[in-house]
C-alpha cells in the first residue's frame, strides 16, 4: 500500500466561497497545513496554492487548486505528473452531498460520484486515488443542490463537519505511513459526539 505523499483539497477560490460547503476539502488541507506548520504559497505554474512539509517523518505535498471546482484537474493533473506522484499516493479531500454533516469516509478508487471536481480529475489520472469524503448533506431536491453546496452551513451543521474533519486530521499519520486500511477503519468508524 502506497504512502500518501500528495494531499489535495477541492474547493473554489475567493473569500466569497471560503465558508461554503463546497470548500470542505479546502478546510481539511488548510487545517492540516496549520497542524504541521506547512506554509501554503501561491503556485501559478500549477494554478493553485501548494506547500511541502514533514508529516510524521514523511515528505508530503499539499495542493489547493485555484481553478474553480469543475476545472480542478487543470491543477491536480500537471502537479502530480510533474512531481511523479502515482494516483495510489494521492488523497483528495472533497465535500460529499450523499452523506450527512458529521459523517466522514475514506474511500479508495471508484468513479466521480457526480462530484464536478472529481469529474475533471478521474479521466486524466484514473480512479485509483484515495478520497476523503466530507459529508455536507443533501438539500432534498436536485434543483437545490447548487445553492446548497455554494451556501454556508448553519452553525449546528458546521460544528458537525468540523468535528469530522478534526477526527480525520488525527489519522493522517496513518495515511502518510501507508497504513490506509487502518486509517479507513478508524476514519469510517467516526460518530459525531
UniProtKB/Swiss-Prot annotation:
Its main location: cytoplasm. Its EC number is 3.1.1.29. It is found in: Cytoplasm. PROSITE patterns: PEPT_TRNA_HYDROL_1, PEPT_TRNA_HYDROL_2. Pfam families: Pept_tRNA_hydro. InterPro entries: Pept_tRNA_hydro, Pept_tRNA_hydro_CS, Pept_tRNA_hydro_sf. CDD domains: PTH. One of its GO terms (biological process) is rescue of stalled ribosome. The record marks 95 as: Stabilizes the basic form of H active site to accept a proton. It catalyses: an N-acyl-L-alpha-aminoacyl-tRNA + H2O = an N-acyl-L-amino acid + a tRNA + H(+). GO terms for molecular function: peptidyl-tRNA hydrolase activity; tRNA binding. Coiled coil: none annotated. Belongs to the PTH family. HAMAP family: Pept_tRNA_hydro_bact. PANTHER family: PEPTIDYL-TRNA HYDROLASE. Monomer. Hydrolyzes ribosome-free peptidyl-tRNAs (with 1 or more amino acids incorporated), which drop off the ribosome during protein synthesis, or as a result of ribosome stalling. This is Peptidyl-tRNA hydrolase. It comes from Acinetobacter baumannii (strain AYE). The gene is pth.
